[in-house]
């Protein structure tokens, strides 16, 4: 039996006692032998940054509420936890703190594990792992070597952001105003060998699979559809001539708008395109531009916003219909890694080409018009002013200035051109995808070593499976430049597994999205010799996955792709890794600042600020507690270090207890919406917890309750019992179907308030109160499990795991009312109410409605034409 001080709610004592009980009984450790239906629920695993933030608390509390509820409704529930432990932040911390990334990472894991345990999550800790351990990453190394043999993993050159000072590749977000975020060096675009996985081989399946994911938010599925970007078009060949008219390798371009082909006035190629490099050999000015463009962005987002730049190469492309020669230009908005690295430019019907052509004085030709213009503006075409209809394929279009294709619509032109090019061998119909193969190489140390050996004779050779894992050395000296394994000859140098000759290991490591793409399956069998074992098919697909919508594209796309790789390797049977996805909103908070001397802002933590209000409670200002002087109110924004508006979960748990923090994080907003952190709201939740504690202890202090006798209840007792069972029904629906935890809490609060006004001290009055209090404790258990654990004992039910106690079921008979209150309307306007027996006859209801004093006044002098009764709700008297 736990020792809890009666009458006084001490959250820390209550929570320590409950957690000790759960640990001693291994309450949340599960296996696959249960006859109960399985439910696999988890949140996206955290990066061990050193401390939890409120976003973590909200995320993990959501999944914990669902997990505990599912246990109480008879499910065998798995809720695991692990650590996404590789990545750049550990390298940065190693430099800053002069320590090895591994040491920093493992210390953070220990600290954050303790924080998670203090919040009382129902986690099966026996399945915990960190992705930076060889026991974990050996399996993705083995999978990679198998993918190499199947041709699904391959190596080719790719353009990356290169920091020449730090000697490393930078992610796009690490390039700030063209410079490395840490070194400040001007970033170059460099082409280096990279390993890729052929996710494009699965593009159509990834797209089609979205239609089966009924439990995923439409917003996420739309983002994935757009990212995959399926488009149908033609691939067309343009012959190329140099300045002397000699033939060069032809260009192949893909277009979804072959109907605009006669509007091509130039062809654009990427700065890295072989034809651009060829032309630059005899054109110093072009060579200088190509060198400059090395410092530009490599992402599509950057290319959309940067200034359009380019130069004529001196080469020409032969128009495949007219035979005219059009110039070939280098353009900084064409990506070598996307499509063929060349696009046909139709400035009359593509806004990007239009802007480029106007800048450089290139011809602009109209070749499409609207068949049914809606106004005069849509009848005019102006080569100097862009209008959206120029490129609107959703409208009925007609070709003009297109020789024999004049008068055709889009579909007719598409078919005619496709037939012509396929017949002449100049092109073909093709489905294209915006999705590109997944580049998995990272020029970093703190990651999983790529299991490849480079031999001068044999080339790239996968490390034999019996030599795996290739272990990353953890005890290293870490500096700002390069990677420790690149400079360690004892690690790097090895022998070729094929010929036995001297060779070198790959010193790149995997993209950390590799580890997070299959961890959900590993939780099912964390000690399996292979990547997973048969237990994976018991648990997979996971039933609920909780995480932020910011992961909609990269993580969730790779996650789905890798699961299909595992399926095709016969490791799992399911097509998709997760059935239902819940994307929780951000945690936001007030921001405060003072103007800095350098023109910037000094952000001040909300905990250091006192809000000033007028007599109506409206905010009038804020002052810094330390000096009493005013600070500016910056509005509410996502909690972040940059705005210094984060709230430390540990300090909140220390001040209020874990249950109160959990309760507020679920009450303040629906899961999908942003949660505004407000300590006044946390205070309100703390008051509710104390009130509930006092209600239970006051009831128990008055003696044991007798057995409930439903037949002997008074009308008031029945009303309270009805409220109890209405609440049970609503909370069950809110937890199980709607995931609307805030309204579930509100319903329990309403019941608590109703119970506080119920002062019936009779035997059956106390029996009704006992039933209501037991229901409240169980209904709140998924959210406030520590207090529920204690109060269940106070109510005389003994110390037990409440997750093994059945979730309350609404008694339908308790919902039946003996009497009903009906609204009385005269000609649709409310004039009064009447109380009638639930089984009252129609004639009796009509008579009572007409006799209601206020209704009778309005009926005076009128004749009743019709009486409409909506059962249980309204009596509408139509009179005239």
UniProtKB/Swiss-Prot annotation:
Name of one Pfam family that matches: tRNA-synt_1g
Protein known as: Leucine--tRNA ligase
CDD domains attached to this UniProt entry: Anticodon_Ia_Leu_BEm, LeuRS_core
Gene: leuS
PROSITE patterns (UniProt xref): AA_TRNA_LIGASE_I (PS00178)
Short sequence motif 'KMSKS' region: positions: 638-642
Keywords: Aminoacyl-tRNA synthetase, ATP-binding, Cytoplasm, Ligase, Nucleotide-binding, Protein biosynthesis
Binding-site residues, ATP: 641
PANTHER family documented for this protein: LEUCINE--TRNA LIGASE, MITOCHONDRIAL, LEUCYL-TRNA SYNTHETASE
Localization (cell): Cytoplasm
GO molecular function: aminoacyl-tRNA deacylase activity; ATP binding; leucine-tRNA ligase activity
Primary site of residence: cytoplasm
Reaction equation(s) it catalyzes: tRNA(Leu) + L-leucine + ATP = L-leucyl-tRNA(Leu) + AMP + diphosphate
Uppermost EC category: ligase
Domain of life assignment: Bacteria
Motif 'HIGH' region, residue numbers: 46-56
GO biological process: leucyl-tRNA aminoacylation
Organism encoding this protein: Xanthomonas oryzae pv. oryzae (strain MAFF 311018)
């Amino acid at each position: 039996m736990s020792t809890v001080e009666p009458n006084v709610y001490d959250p820390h004592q209550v929570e320590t006692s409950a957690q000790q009980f759960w640990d001693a009984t291994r309450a949340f450790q599960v296996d696959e032998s249960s006859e109960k239906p399985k439910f696999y629920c988890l949140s996206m695993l955290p990066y061990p940054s050193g401390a939890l933030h409120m976003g973590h608390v909200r995320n993990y509390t959501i999944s914990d509420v669902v997990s505990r509820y599912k246990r109480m409704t008879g499910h065998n529930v798995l809720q695991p936890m692990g650590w996404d432990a590789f990545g750049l932040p550990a390298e940065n911390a190693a430099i800053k703190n002069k320590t090895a990334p591994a040491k920093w990472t493992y210390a953070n894991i220990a600290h954050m594990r303790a924080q998670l345990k203090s919040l009382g999550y129902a986690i099966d800790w026996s399945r915990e792992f960190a992705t930076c351990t060889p026991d974990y990453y050996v399996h993705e190394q083995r999978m990679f070597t198998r993918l190499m043999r199947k041709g699904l993993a391959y190596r080719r050159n790719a353009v990356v952001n290169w920091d020449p000072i730090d000697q490393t590749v930078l992610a796009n977000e690490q390039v700030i105003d063209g410079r490395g975020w840490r070194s400040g060096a001007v970033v170059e675009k460099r082409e280096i060998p990279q390993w890729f996985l052929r996710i494009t081989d699965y593009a159509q399946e990834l797209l089609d699979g979205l239609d089966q994911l009924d439990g995923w938010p439409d917003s996420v599925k739309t983002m994935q559809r757009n990212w995959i970007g399926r488009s149908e078009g033609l691939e067309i060949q343009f012959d190329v001539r140099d300045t002397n008219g000699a033939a060069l390798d032809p260009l192949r371009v893909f277009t979804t708008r072959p109907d605009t082909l006669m509007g091509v006035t130039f062809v654009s190629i990427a700065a890295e395109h072989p034809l651009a490099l060829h032309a630059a050999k005899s054109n110093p000015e072009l060579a200088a531009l190509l060198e400059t463009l090395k410092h530009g962005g490599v992402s599509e987002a950057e290319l959309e916003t940067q200034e359009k730049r380019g130069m004529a190469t001196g080469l020409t492309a032969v128009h495949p219909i007219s035979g005219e020669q059009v110039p070939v230009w280098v353009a900084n908005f064409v990506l070598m890694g996307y499509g063929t690295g060349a696009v046909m430019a139709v400035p009359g019907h593509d806004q990007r080409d239009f802007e480029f052509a106007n800048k450089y004085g290139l011809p602009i030709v109209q070749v499409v018009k609207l068949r049914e213009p809606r106004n005069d503006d849509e009848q005019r075409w102006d080569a100097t002013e862009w209008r959206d209809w120029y490129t609107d394929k959703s409208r009925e279009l007609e070709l003009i200035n297109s020789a024999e294709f004049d008068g055709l619509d889009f579909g007719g032109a598409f078919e005619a051109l496709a037939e012509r090019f396929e017949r002449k061998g100049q092109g073909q119909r093709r489905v294209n995808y915006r999705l590109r193969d997944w580049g998995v190489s990272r020029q970093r140390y703190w990651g999983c070593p790529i299991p490849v050996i480079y031999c001068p004779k044999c080339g790239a050779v996968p490390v034999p499976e019996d030599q795996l894992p290739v272990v990353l050395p953890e005890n290293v000296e870490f500096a700002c430049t390069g990677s420790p394994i690149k400079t360690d000859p004892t690690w790097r140098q090895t022998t070729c597994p094929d010929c036995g000759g001297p060779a070198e290991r790959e010193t790149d490591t995997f993209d950390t999205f590799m580890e997070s793409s299959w961890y959900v399956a590993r939780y099912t069998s964390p000690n399996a010799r292979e990547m997973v074992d048969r237990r994976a098919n018991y648990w997979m697909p996971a039933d609920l996955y909780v995480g932020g919508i910011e992961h909609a594209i990269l993580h969730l796309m790779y996650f789905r792709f890798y699961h299909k790789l595992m399926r095709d390797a016969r490791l799992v049977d399911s097509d998709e890794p997760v059935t239902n996805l819940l994307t929780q909103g951000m945690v936001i908070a007030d921001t405060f600042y003072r103007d800095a001397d350098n023109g910037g802002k000094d952000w001040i933590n909300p905990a250091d600020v006192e809000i000033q209000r007028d007599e109506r409670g409206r905010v009038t200002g804020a002052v810094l507690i330390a000096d009493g002087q005013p600070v500016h109110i910056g509005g509410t924004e996502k909690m972040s270090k940059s705005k210094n508006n984060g709230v430390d979960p540990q300090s909140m748990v220390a001040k209020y207890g874990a249950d109160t923090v959990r309760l507020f994080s679920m009450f303040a907003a629906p899961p999908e919406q942003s949660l505004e952190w407000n300590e006044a709201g946390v205070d309100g939740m703390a008051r509710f917890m104390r009130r509930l504690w006092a209600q239970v202890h006051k009831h128990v202090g008055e003696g044991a309750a007798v057995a409930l006798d439903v037949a002997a209840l008074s009308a008031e007792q029945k009303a309270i019992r009805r409220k109890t069972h209405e609440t049970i029904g609503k909370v069950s629906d809110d937890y199980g179907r709607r995931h609307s935890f805030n309204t579930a809490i509100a319903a329990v609060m309403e019941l608590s308030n109703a119970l506080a006004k119920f002062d019936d001290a009779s035997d059956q009055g106390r029996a009704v109160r006992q039933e209501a209090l037991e229901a409240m404790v169980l209904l709140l258990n998924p959210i406030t499990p520590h207090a529920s654990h204690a109060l269940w004992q106070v109510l005389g039910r003994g110390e037990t795991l409440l997750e093994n106690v059945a979730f309350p079921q609404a008694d339908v008979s308790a919902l039946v009312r003996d009497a009903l209150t009906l609204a009385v309307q005269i000609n649709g306007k409310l004039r009064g109410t009447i109380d009638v027996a639930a089984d009252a006859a129609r004639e009796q209801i009509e008579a009572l409605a007409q006799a209601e004093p206020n209704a009778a006044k309005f009926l005076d002098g009128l004749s009743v034409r019709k009486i409409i009764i909506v059962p249980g709700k309204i009596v509408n008297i139509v009179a005239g």
